[in-house]
Amino acid sequence: MLFMKKQKNLLFIVLIFCSSAFAQRQMEYLNRGVVAVPDGGNIFVSWRLLVTDDDKTAFNIYRAVDNSKAVKVNKTPVDAFTHYIDVKADSTKSYTYYVTPVVKGKELAASEKFTLPALAKNYLSIPLRTPEGYSANDASVGDLDGDGEYEVIIHLTGRAKDNSQAGITDPPIFQAYKMNGTFLWQINLGKNIREGAHYTQFMVYDLDGDGKAEIAMKTGDGSIDSKGNVIGDSSKDWRNERGYILSGPEYLSVFNGLTGEVINTTDYISPRHGKLNPTTDELKTMWGDGYGNRMDRFLACVAYLDGVHPSLVMCRGYYTRTILAAWDLKGGKLVKRWVFDSNDEGNKPYAGQGNHNLSVADVDGDGKDEIVYGQMTIDDNGKGLYSTGIGHA
């Protein structure tokens, strides 16, 4: 009995050690993100729970009218939610809110303040500098300047086409704004990046750990950063008579999130073909069609492949051939970590298993992320973990 008890104690210690053995992931610094909006005749206040907060952290909510002294509006610290409905507020007045975390009955440092104007709408509005013929499309957020507050990065689209549709498109445009409406920059991907939902997957994340998010996306000859710097050869036009881009170089670029200036550009992995100008038959053999549909289905994500640092993963294809390329941003350079190609020897079961989306998760509990790619999963080391064989579904 004594021996069994010692075994159980040892097992308990081992389990505790294993559960805490994984290194802390490199995370972005964020403030409380306090925001308030009208909610009927009340004011809805919300804030952010941080990963560094104690599990038993509660919050007090403070409100000030105009320039008066702030008063606490909650009776007891709020510990079950990260929002509060202020039923005693008057939406015709301007209020300033902030919260203070409470741990073991003691108030800690107050959050940043948020001012709600009188008669405000129940949403935040950011005026856009939308070019003629364009409209706002996909958006992402990231802390571009390191102040703990998210900025908004918007993909503006003009004429666009699905991969299955022929036709000339307008160049994809990206703009960044602060939450107060301040315009930061514009990037124009140019005529050699086709516009459409499947073509440009842009990632916004702090890839190098400097506290500021970068922007990464596929670029082409003639892409222009916010400072007017041209990527590749702007004189080239690789579009064919049907509007598809089946030849020419392909690039992967990472941009400074605050300025929109290109940091580094490298060859995109994997290119549509080993040749710069492949024939339609050569493309069909590799991708299943030769006119630019299946080969230009792109996905992307950010994953903690080593369990600590974020890596950029750019993906191509899911109907037939599938390629995932993982990159790290080190010293201002994109460094290839690994490439998974379903055409490689032993990877045939992983072909044609992709979908129109992907997920990132530590599915095997080793503290490192895997890429769940439709009906198959790629391990953190770039090797196939498993494939269900169900196919595109």
What is the predicted role of each segment?
Residues 27-31, 40, 49-54, 64, ...:
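Beta-propeller-forming repeat regions
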Residues 1-3:
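Short, Lys/Arg-enriched N-terminal segments with co-localized hydrophobic residues
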Residues 20, 55-56:
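Amphipathic alpha-helical interaction segments
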Residues 58-61:
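Short beta-strand elements bearing conserved aromatic residues within extracellular beta-rich modules
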Residues 14-23:
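Hydrophobic h-region of N-terminal signal peptides that target proteins for export
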Residues 6-13:
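Sec-dependent signal peptide recognition
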Residues 36-42:
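Beta-strand-rich domain onsets/edges
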